[in-house]
Amino acid sequence: MLRNQIDKIRLLFRKDRESYLCFYRILGFYPHNIQIYEQALLHKSSAVRSEKGRPLNNERLEFLGDAILDAIVGDIVYKRFEGKREGFLTNTRSKIVQRETLNKLAVEIGLDKLIKYSTRSSSHNSYMYGNAFEAFIGAIYLDQGYERCKQFMEQRIINRYIDLDKISRKEVNFKSKLIEWSQKNKMEVSFELIEQFLDHDSNPVFQTEVRIEGLPAGTGTGYSKKESQQNAAQMAIKKVKDQTFMDTVNEAKSQHSKPSEVETESVEPELTESETMEPDTLETEAPEAETTADKVETTVNEVEATETEKE
């Protein structure tokens, strides 16, 4: 409380107080370093650069915010649902931090109106709001620390916009989402049961691996094949947002398309070989052509000899 009063007094002497007030309405407290929050709202298409000429965007803050958000929501869910299994806690957390939910939360608190991006860029996508929300969480963490960041999530986000009991019961079909993504992007996705074992209570446990274009994209365990597939698909959905992984997938996909070219090239030597046999055929026929010519010449000589005798 005292800190906010001091910040209010300082704010009176700042030229950029409107920006501070804007963030205060979202956060419930005044930022210490407002530049971090402004950078959290810079999409990579904005083409903003630092004084040294380096591009400024929210991608690094997004990376940090993703990890912090997982930790905070995991903390909240763990304490809210005592006695629940790890699979239940993981699924509940995933429903909160999935991109669709974060997109909606960004709009709810007004971040969508503050994001700076280029309208001419094709990189503008449906995940931009959710990515900015993660970057915003990263900014809070750097500016205020973990506890203040957790307080923001509990008081300003979850208590206002998320019903934990309701969302924990909501079924999300991650496998269907992954298959839909694969069809849209023309990627080959497969699910493989790689292990089956018993837990300490002798309950059967299944482990499934998801492969995208033959590359491992996620593994999941569960007390049924369906549950293990869902958990594996959930991990894969997160994995496909990693650009480095997707570069590897696209390279693998391009390699898979090359065998047809190799097969086409392998036919050419056979055609060439058959073509090289034609001179042999001509050489074989050549003696026959010469024999016929000899016969004609012999016949002509005989006719001339006969005419000479008559004379």
Curated annotation (Swiss-Prot):
Belongs to the ribonuclease III family. It comes from Bacteroides thetaiotaomicron (strain ATCC 29148 / DSM 2079 / JCM 5827 / CCUG 10774 / NCTC 10582 / VPI-5482 / E50). Homodimer. Residues 262-288 have a biased composition (Acidic residues). This is Ribonuclease 3. InterPro entries: dsRBD_dom (IPR014720), RNase_III (IPR011907), RNase_III_dom (IPR000999), RNase_III_sf (IPR036389). The gene is rnc. GO terms for molecular function: double-stranded RNA binding; metal ion binding; ribonuclease III activity; rRNA binding. One of its GO terms (biological process) is tRNA processing. Residues 173-242 form the DRBM domain.
